[in-house]
Amino acid sequence: MKKKIFMVLSAVAVLTMGVLIVACSNDSNTLNPNEKVILEEVVTTPTLQKNSAAEWAAFNLEIEKLKAKYLTPEVVGRAMRIGRDSGALSKEEKVLIVLADLWGGAHGVKGGLSFGIWGAVAGAVIEGAIESLLMWGGLTLSGCMVGINPLSSIDGLDSDSLANVIGGRHNILIEKIMTSNIDVVNMSSHALLVEITNQYERLFGPLPNLLKSSILSMNIGEIQDPISVDIEQATAQYVNMIVDLNGIQKHAYTEEYLEVMDITLADSEEKTQMLAGIGTGYHSASLWEIEGQP
């Protein structure tokens, strides 16, 4: 009799635990009213404005809470695995994945580099191809930077034109650097950063002072000097400078996050291309005004 009672109680306990797990799981994927307000502000406001550092700090804290609650490695991994079917995620789920991509652009260069990772995730989810990682890391951010509603970008708002502008300007700038008399081989990484910034301004016009000072104050960290004359390596090392700026280890994209997101890249060259690709999107969306370009 005692054994039967114990078995019944055990079964009830297991069932109760299962119900609680399901309930908690469902709750964790449902925005509460306060979170809906925050999310609405992020995805519908092209340029977020706060009156003080304290307001920014409070807002950033709420965004971090949202990211921690909804964008766990497990959720990201799931999104990546089912992302080849763009209809597999609801629009709200897509927005939540893009969410962590947005505040970096809205808050400026030092707002957080993790948008590169999450923008890439959004790319694979939305476009359904690994190749899109090289483009969407910048595209979602560019929507925020130039006043394009990110939700519209998800629905396909002229993404091809944005990609062409991003890729075109990046290629022009790199070609200008590599075909000039600049001594890239013997130049320090920081000197190259300064030169690239100067060349950009000569080609495309001045950068805002605050943005320019932020770029030029980057911590070059572990970058090895002199950098290689090889364009791909030069691009990758320049990207690493930005990774270091935000305190993220320079192999975070190519090792830990790719493993979490269940992506297998064939070799180190492919990893380098992905790293450089995400960085290209970052530079393009952050440094270059896209709106109104042909």
Each model region followed by its residue ranges:
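C-terminal motif of bacterial Sec signal peptides marking the signal peptidase cleavage site
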Residues: 19-23
